[in-house]
């Protein structure tokens, strides 16, 4: 598909957008669970164990709260389970969440660096290094290029509030596209209007438009239905 896919709706794009809106803000239960259930969260470690702990944590938060969980709440919950892997998981997560909560970046460069650090830490999870699947495949590459371009131009951005940075990032990521370089079938292409004008084909099959303007629909007739008019050669 020559139009590509919106970067903002890809897995890396969604994760980066979630994090951009959470920096310096109180974390609600729903916002926390949105992050934990994202397919890239803790993708660098044991994803199955992460999902198991996320499920158990959700049950506790839904029943007992708190409404605005912080890192200490997660560590306390994990310590009560007497499970070493759960405690390691909670401590890793708490460090990332507390960094996002208490961060006070001012310059654009600081916003970008913090944003990338949080995304990579969340995707890495309990793995000793790396960034999980955050920058992998076409969508990850497009997201990485966006962050690197923003960092390269950040010196000209001056100081921004957290809300200003969130709005800036939203506007940039919504312009991004993810293009799949792999042709699914050599004889089938889905082209936009611009690309279609630049191509030639030995056979062109014209289909109807969605709005029904072409081919034009026959006018209603009080005497003959469409089939009768077609049989009579009137269509």
Can you say where each PLM-predicted feature lies in the sequence?
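Polyanion-engaging groove/track-forming segments
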Residues: 1-235
């Amino acid at each position: 598909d020559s139009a590509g896919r919106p970067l903002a709706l890809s897995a890396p794009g969604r994760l980066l957008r979630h994090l951009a809106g959470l920096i310096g803000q109180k974390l609600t239960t729903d916002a926390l669970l949105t992050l934990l259930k994202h397919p890239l969260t803790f993708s660098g470690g044991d994803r199955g164990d992460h999902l198991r702990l996320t499920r158990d944590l959700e049950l506790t938060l839904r029943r007992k709260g708190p409404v605005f969980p912080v890192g200490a709440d997660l560590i306390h919950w994990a310590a009560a389970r007497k499970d070493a892997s759960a405690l390691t998981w909670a401590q890793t997560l708490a460090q990332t969440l507390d960094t996002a909560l208490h961060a006070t970046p001012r310059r654009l460069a600081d916003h970008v660096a913090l944003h990338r650090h949080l995304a990579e830490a969340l995707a890495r999870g309990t793995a000793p290094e790396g960034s999980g699947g955050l920058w992998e495949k076409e969508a990850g590459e497009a997201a990485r290029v966006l962050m690197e371009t923003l960092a390269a131009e950040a010196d000209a951005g001056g100081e921004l509030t957290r809300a200003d940075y969130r709005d800036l990032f939203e506007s940039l990521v919504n312009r991004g596209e993810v293009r799949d370089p792999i042709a699914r079938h050599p004889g089938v292409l889905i082209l936009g209007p611009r690309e279609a004008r630049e191509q030639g084909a030995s056979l062109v099959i014209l289909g109807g438009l969605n709005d029904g303007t072409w081919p034009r629909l026959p006018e209603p007739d009080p005497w003959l239905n469409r089939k009768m008019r077609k049989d009579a050669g009137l269509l």
